[in-house]
Amino acid sequence: MALIEICLALVVIGYLIYKWSTATFKTFEERKLYFEKPYPFVGNMAAAALQKSSFQRQLTEFYERTRQHKLVGFFNMRTPMITLNDPELIKKVCVKDFDHFPNHQPFITSNDRLFNDMLSVMRDQRWKHMRNTLTPVFTAAKMRNMFTLMNESFAECLQHLDSSSKTLPGRKGFEVDMKVMCNKLSNDIIATTAFGLKVNSYDNPKNEFYEIGQSLVFSRGLQFFKFMLSTLVPKLFSLLKLTIFDSAKVDYFARLVVEAMQYREKHNITRPDMIQLLMEAKNESEDKWTDDEIVAQCFIFFFAAFENNSNLICTTTYELLYNPDVQERLYEEIVETKKALNGAPLTYDAVQKMTYMDMVISESLRKWTLAAATDRLCSKDYTLTDDDGTKLFDFKVGDRINIPISGLHLDDRYFPEPRKFDPDRFSEERKGDMVPYTYLPFGVGPRNCIGNRYALMQVKGMLFNLLLHYKIEASPRTIKDLWGSASGFNFTPRSGFWMHLVPRK
């Protein structure tokens, strides 16, 4: 009898959990919006949630199946979102009528110190004030000074590669996991430019900054699980006061920044890094920012820059090894730039003048976009209409909007032969043909990425140094189908980003 009661209880519990997991799935049926059938718990994100596919691939394939609809219902796990497939509608929501959609959706439910103080998470006037405070931090003039710090990290990376080539005398080049190498580079650049800390993760791969930083990245196993849990059961996550990040590790980064600020103020020390720029911005702002709010802007580099900058270098070098004509043309521009420097170190201005470099990076950002999508949250009821005034949809306060960046980037209506790597799409002659709001590598509207200059100068600087000294070729372990082999948030193959580097001299 007891066994029967236990079985019945389990059946009831299982049924209740199932009903909870599907409770939102009638949303679009009731609001008369086309949608694809979702699955319990995972919605329309089954493959990505189970890490059998990358988020980019899952979202792009969803877009390809539904792109004939200007708007379509989409379930991010249990959360209903309205996807805007039409560029003109994206313009309306993200630019023209921004006041109705000024915020991002709650990315995750977090009880973590610092997380809710990040610019990308802030809302309304608080976000606006911080954005205005930070905008002068990312001007070309400020990035120009910071580039000198990046040059030091580029040099250390090249020294490491040079040492690797010398350990294999007589061989034509050597194999390297570009992802591992670029993670260390990204880490060291963030350490010096955002936290005022000098580390060399090639000579000392066990340094505290690198190991703690690696453990905080969302794509890592435990962090990924916690992220998915906070997305699936946000109220429970908040109620139990669970945290995604180890508080001791968060405190480590906070302590680095606060102690650096205190030391510099006491000894009147300046350095062209993010801490210095934030200190100056804080002093010039009418708002009274707390230390945690300042620290959070440095902390965001681990989420906005660490993986993204590393992956952009990896996907670009991946394309260069499979497109040797592009690689050779870029190398020729690099050699010309090197000659023009006349023995001087690489500068921010020199990098900015490299037109083909910019075309290559732009095409890489199109084909292998850093963020598969961006989002908005409706803050005021809003009726979305077509150009002729036809009503398309009534948005309610709290509705979440999905902008399918990767889908737009790979849509053959906007980019012919979208799977082809063709930097000439971004030539002066052709880029004017691009349909507005179909190319969104750094987001769209007032809430676009504030740090795009920072990201681009790091990637361009590293590619300049790498291609100047090495030719990139395929190795036996080079992945052939990156699209099909990647999983998680970014295009990182499970087996690694292996490539063969051949010294040019």
UniProtKB/Swiss-Prot annotation:
InterPro entries per the UniProt record, alphabetical: Cyt_P450 (IPR001128), Cyt_P450_CS (IPR017972), Cyt_P450_E_grp-IV (IPR002403), Cyt_P450_sf (IPR036396), Insect_CytP450_Detox (IPR050476)
Supply the SUPFAM superfamilies for this chain.
Cytochrome P450
Q: How does it sit in the membrane?
A: Peripheral membrane protein
- Please provide, alphabetically and separated by semicolons, the GO molecular function terms listed in this UniProt record: heme binding; iron ion binding; monooxygenase activity; oxidoreductase activity, acting on paired donors, with incorporation or reduction of molecular oxygen
Keyword list (alphabetical) reads: Endoplasmic reticulum, Heme, Iron, Membrane, Metal-binding, Microsome, Monooxygenase, Oxidoreductase
Output the Pfam families linked to this UniProt entry. Answer: p450 (PF00067)
* A GO CC term attached to the entry: endoplasmic reticulum membrane
Please state where this protein is localized. Endoplasmic reticulum membrane; Microsome membrane
UniProt family annotation: Belongs to the cytochrome P450 family.
What is the protein's name according to its record? Cytochrome P450 9b2
